[in-house]
Amino acid sequence: MGKNLLKKERDPSILILDFGSQYSELIARRIREANVFSLVVSNFISTKEIQDINPQGIILSGGPNSVYEDNAPKCDQNIFNLGIPVLGICYGMQLMVKELGGTVTPANNRSEYGRAPIKIDFESDLLSSVKDKSIMWMSHGDSINHLPNGFIKIAHTENTLHAAISNKEKKLFGVQFHPEVIHSEYGMTVIKNFVYSISKCKADWNTETFLEETIPRIKEQVGDKKVLLALSGGVDSSTLAFLLNKAIGKQLTCMFIDQGFMRKGEPEFLMEFFAKKFHIKVEYINARERFLHKLNGVTDPEEKRKIIGGEFIRVFEEESHRLGPFEYLAQGTLYPDVIESAGTNLDPKTGERIAVKIKSHHNVGGLPKDLQFKLVEPLRKLFKDEVRKLGNALGLPDEIIKRHPFPGPGLAIRILGEVSIEKLNCLRDADWIVRDEIKKAGLYNDIWQAFAVLLPVKTVGVMGDKRTYAWPVVLRCVSSEDGMTADWSRIPYETLERISNRIVNEVAQVNRVVFDITSKPPGTIEWE
């Protein structure tokens, strides 16, 4: 594979050093909500690398470790002598204190988890406009016992002596709470204070500046060469198709592989929308029978995913050779994909991950290395909400921008057990009814995902005067900000009743509808 970074990319104004926190990505998103560009990087980043990037501020994330554990993640101590403002959050603050000569002790029975009012002790730039006794979100076991020289305590709680600290002269700050989570009442105020007042960042990160910077980079990278894009119809690949079409026009070819597991009417809609309405070159590949044959007799969900992913690659290889040659491959890789799949916490000396790998994403490292493409990934540093804003700016309609996430393997992993034509047709119809009624009720844009799942068992029912023995369908509706966590959606009973009545009356081989009220965690959004 060739280089996957475009030239002259914008450097982040704020660097977030990741110590294994579940909130590191959220910190970056919150800063970008303040229109400041931020990136999550490894805690192993060197002082020299930071100086090369030249950020205006640095944030040390939280993390699950104690600073006194043998394997506790650390950072280059010289970071604190660069003159760049540093904000340590939770573990990040404790690490800074320990590295600079203070002491951190186990909290024992005085741990804090959840909401806690903070008492402000001294005025400071960091807590400017934060009201006294406002609620902040705590999640820590250890606490600071003694501050390093030059630091003062600027806030405390009932159980935490040092809820916020400051060394104004060296521009080093710390908070024991998590300002990035929505439960922290003045969390965004604290973040903006650090970003604007302390780090002197400009609010110049938005969709317009992204387009102004990215389109010339794409043109510079691609030149007059041809680019191939695998189009799925989701918001990511659709936005990328529009972006590339704007940048390089007829040099772009989209390949739409219909594996037979898409939602009702979707292949026809996508071809009509992209090829006919917007005149983007799309090659339609009908591989339905091929994929279904490969899944014959397969029931394990992970095996289904691997088979579908592997077959997609083989079809893609064959068709790219037939349609090519292509110099570049465009992928709709997003920043969370990079964080989760590549990992930010890689020890540059050993290559080992600090955090456990969550999952492999289709867009990151999914294609074989012997495909001689150079990568074009202009969305690689964007979050999902930023991609939606970009799609809107490029003229994508709401029916694309606001469509619910759909898994790469499609309906094949919403059919538990073996996949068949009969089951696909059944689930496709049931799923269409779910989305149709959710839209009619005006709930679609308020729900992260709404879909149907077909179970591999049959249940007894009565229709008319006859006994039935048919499949049950599960209705799954969840609300979420980013898909990392989710709660089940409180759908009005009237809507649930309409969905149930329509499915059992309009979909053959279904006689029962059940509603999944499991949150994530402990469950996942998808059933497989």
UniProtKB/Swiss-Prot annotation:
SUPFAM superfamilies: Adenine nucleotide alpha hydrolases-like, Class I glutamine amidotransferase-like, GMP synthetase C-terminal dimerisation domain. It catalyses: XMP + L-glutamine + ATP + H2O = GMP + L-glutamate + AMP + diphosphate + 2 H(+). Its EC number is 6.3.5.2. Homodimer. The active site is at C90 (nucleophile), H178, E180. The gene is guaA. Catalyzes the synthesis of GMP from XMP. One of its GO terms (cellular component) is cytosol. Keywords: ATP-binding, Glutamine amidotransferase, GMP biosynthesis, Ligase, Nucleotide-binding, Purine biosynthesis. Disulfide bonds: none annotated. This is GMP synthase [glutamine-hydrolyzing]. GO terms for molecular function: ATP binding; GMP synthase activity. InterPro entries: Class_I_gatase-like (IPR029062), GATASE (IPR017926), GMP_synth_C (IPR001674), GMP_synth_GATase (IPR004739), GMP_synthase (IPR022955), GMPS_ATP_PPase_dom (IPR025777), NAD/GMP_synthase (IPR022310), Rossmann-like_a/b/a_fold (IPR014729). PANTHER family: GMP SYNTHASE [GLUTAMINE-HYDROLYZING], GMP SYNTHASE-RELATED. ATP binds at S232, G233, G234, V235, D236, S237, S238.
